[in-house]
Amino acid sequence: MRPLIIGIAGGTGSGKTTLVENLKEQFGADISVLPNDNYYAAHHDMSLEERQTLNYDHPAAFDTDRMIQDLEDLKAGKTVQCPVYDYAIHDRTEATLTLAPNKVILVEGILIFENKALRDLMDIKIFVDTDADVRILRRILRDVKERGRTLESVMEQYLTTVKPMHEQFVEPSKRYADVIVPEGGKNLVALMMIVQRIAYHIEHGDVVDEQ
């Protein structure tokens, strides 16, 4: 069975991860997740202070070529070794994450629709669309609680890079989406539609015809 590859994009704090977690809870072992954040480029030659000043919301921040190769390998039925990114040190670690091919692969991240070669590997493209005020509040809570950031650093990053990069790259990529989901995982109607499509694929092995 060729995997069903679903891209889930949207701005920071939009609810992408909540949607992914809801789908994983629904289908368990039949779903694997390939997060865009794992593919932040390595900067071992920089100090922590230098890495903290980088723009992590620009397409150049990601090792997209490696992500494309890993997704192609998964699509071909091969197991891949995904990089692992550590938010505390703002760098890729030496560890890798083993990801085996699966019936469904969820590709999740803010910029996964920006690159044509990457989005062309996806059978279904979903954009999670959430109000900017809600997104920034969620980002503050996440980065302070889960990633050890200060409120001041989160706000500075949002104003200097996150917001302008969202307007330049993330929001325009919405036009490539097959489905736009307001409020992410909290949109139960959209969630059930996606669940039904995945369930059909798992049962019948049917995927969208290749272009």
Where do the PLM segments sit?
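ATP-dependent NMP and nucleoside kinases share a basic, alpha-helical "lid"
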Residues: 93-147
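P-loop (Walker A) phosphate-binding loop of NTP-binding proteins
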Residues: 11
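Conserved lysine of the Walker
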Residues: 16
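Conserved nucleotide-sensing/catalytic segment adjacent to the nucleotide-binding pocket
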Residues: 32-33, 45-89
